[in-house]
Amino acid sequence: MISPAWSIFLIGTKIGLFLQVAPLSVMAKSCPSVCRCDAGFIYCNDRFLTSIPTGIPEDATTLYLQNNQINNAGIPSDLKNLLKVERIYLYHNSLDEFPTNLPKYVKELHLQENNIRTITYDSLSKIPYLEELRLDDNSVSAVSIEEGAFRDSNYLRLLFLSRNHLSTIPWGLPRTIEELRLDDNRIPTISSPSLQGLTSLKRLVLDGNLLNNHGLGDKVFFNLVNLTELSLVRNSLTAAPVNLPGTNLRKLYLQDNHINRVPPNAFSYLRQLYRLDMSNNNLSNLPQGIFDDLDNITQLILRNNPWYCGCKMKWVRDWLQSLPVKVNVRGLMCQAPEKVRGMAIKDLNAELFDCKDSGIVSTIQITTAIPNTVYPAQEQWPAPVTKQPDIKNPKLTKDHQTTGSPSRKTITITVKSVTSDTIHISWKLALPMTALRLSWLKLGHSPAFGSITETIVTGERSEYLVTALEPDSPYKVCMVPMETSNLYLFDETPVCIETETAPLRMYNPTTTLNREQEKEPYKNPNLPLAAIIGGAVALVTIALLALVCWYVHRNGSLFSRNCAYSKGRRRKDDYAEAGTKKDNSILEIRETSFQMLPISNEPISKEEFVIHTIFPPNGMNLYKNNHSESSSNRSYRDSGIPDSDHSHS
């Protein structure tokens, strides 16, 4: 049996504990008025906020702040006190620097679609437990990443830097990274040290860069022993890369390049590879046995290649017919010769390969006869193709011409200044080529900052017009023979030339066509006699028509008075003539006009007379007032114009 005193003590203790815990509970469940809170998820997105609201609950785990206008000044310092926050969504805001004051234990940070330019060690060291960092669609460049910025990011597994301004792979990335996305930047080269140590990397995406075979080191991917997916889509490769890591690589994407050759050892030891895509390239044949090591291949996609179904492709037919059902091969359709065009290689008979044909496409190694060749260093703008001490460099005039070598002209380039911001580039090829890489750079600019502009032109073209240049500025133009028709060109040495645009003023045309076009408005050409006579007749005819129209308009009233009926009259004209004439006659209205018929020749008396109206046959109604006591009585037509029925002499 509990005594009353002891019961009172227990009740008081419970009340005290409740009073202490209640404020904390209320504070934990508070929510900013502009947000919505739901069990640790704070929804403040799409609210046009310029700063992160205060009063976020302490038990928050995920902050949705995307699609606002939050800038760096709008991140409060007390945000770092939210120790339970693990995910922050700040994409599509107005950040121009990597944000600070973030919660220490955040693991997932979304900063896409801002304008972030710099990444510093100070900002990353305050969030050491970060595992996923997404920086797509920002303005990050290689020089804006501080050296050693990631040295304390020992838990970082995923780094997305797609669609930025990178010209090289960032140095010093943590070894823990498993997925690295660098697509749609301007990376021309990848050296072995840049990826050295990334032994945990499983997925590497390098789509849409400026990579060619010279820009890839010999064994740049070889040490990535855990790599399972490699994507090199939309680059400038002319041959499939070699020395790929064969231990775990399962997916390889090489589509949308300029690959016209596959080295025999390109896919050696890739026994785990099950998906290979080489669509949209320039492959016409494949070396025999190229797929022998692909033990686990199940998806082989080779669409949109100019396959030449000659004798060298007969082995492919035999290989396809021996594959198990689980292997899915797409895109092996003949494009040449014409007799098998559009047919699947797998369905061809042995006789159709025509192995005795002397015109079979073959792959031959060729080297260009260019003496004293200077090979460009990596990450630098390529030097001129030859050293010729006895020949002076061309002066910076409007027109220039250069060739690959006096002994053998591989490419001959001619550049002409067309306008103050346009140059015309033309070239001649000594060898048939499938594609060339044309690039231009304003002199005085560093290639590291993305000022090089490149484009791929087909071998059939012989000229190109470059626009949107700066007036009165020097430029360097280079061309690289990427490949030749059915041949592989190992030496991709550029041929360069310097030129300058015209000053910004009234441009004086330099071409004969432009001169003729400018002079043409001031010429007095001899017109044909028939044209002169026809023009004179037309002018006289127009003048006569104008005179007739003027005369008819002037005498229109006279003509109408001579007619008994005038259908074009208006009702108010009838009223005006009928109500003002004084005559001892009867007013007859016919159609829309009238006629005064005299009754006798007697003089008009001064007595009051009444004009009796004869209604016309067209149904026009006249509303008449029967009150005739006063001379001021009036009746109104339906048009509102007064009509006097009584008049006094």
From Swiss-Prot:
Glycosylation is annotated at N226, N282, N296
| Region: Interaction with ADGRL3, residue numbers | 38-67
Per UniProt, the keywords (alphabetical) are: Cell adhesion, Cell junction, Cell membrane, Cell projection, Developmental protein, Disulfide bond, Endoplasmic reticulum, Glycoprotein, Leucine-rich repeat, Membrane, Repeat, Secreted, Signal, Synapse, Transmembrane, Transmembrane helix
Xref: PROSITE patterns: FN3 (PS50853), LRR (PS51450)
Note the subunit structure.
Monomer and homodimer. Self-associates (via leucine-rich repeats), giving rise to homooligomers. Interacts with FGFR1. Interacts (via extracellular domain) with ADGRL1/LPHN1 and LPHN2 (via olfactomedin-like domain). Interacts (via extracellular domain) with ADGRL3 (via olfactomedin-like domain); the interaction is direct. Interacts (via extracellular domain) with UNC5B and UNC5D (via extracellular domain); the interaction is direct. Identified in complexes composed of FLRT3, ADGRL3 and UNC5B, respectively FLRT3, ADGRL3 and UNC5D.
Which top-level group of life is the source organism from? Eukaryota
Protein's cellular compartments: Cell membrane; Presynaptic cell membrane; Endoplasmic reticulum membrane; Cell junction, Focal adhesion
Q: Where is the composition biased (Basic and acidic residues)?
A: 389-401
What are the ranges of the LRR repeats? 59-80, 84-104, 105-126, 129-150, 155-176, 177-197, 200-220, 226-247, 248-269, 272-293
- PANTHER family to which the protein is assigned, alphabetical: AGAP008170-PA (PTHR45712), LEUCINE-RICH REPEAT TRANSMEMBRANE PROTEIN FLRT3 (PTHR45712:SF12)
Q: What membrane topology is given?
A: Single-pass membrane protein
Q: Post-translation: what modifications?
A: N-glycosylated. Proteolytic cleavage in the juxtamembrane region gives rise to a soluble ectodomain. Cleavage is probably effected by a metalloprotease.
Note whether Transcription regulation occurs among the keywords.
no
Name assigned to this protein? Leucine-rich repeat transmembrane protein FLRT3
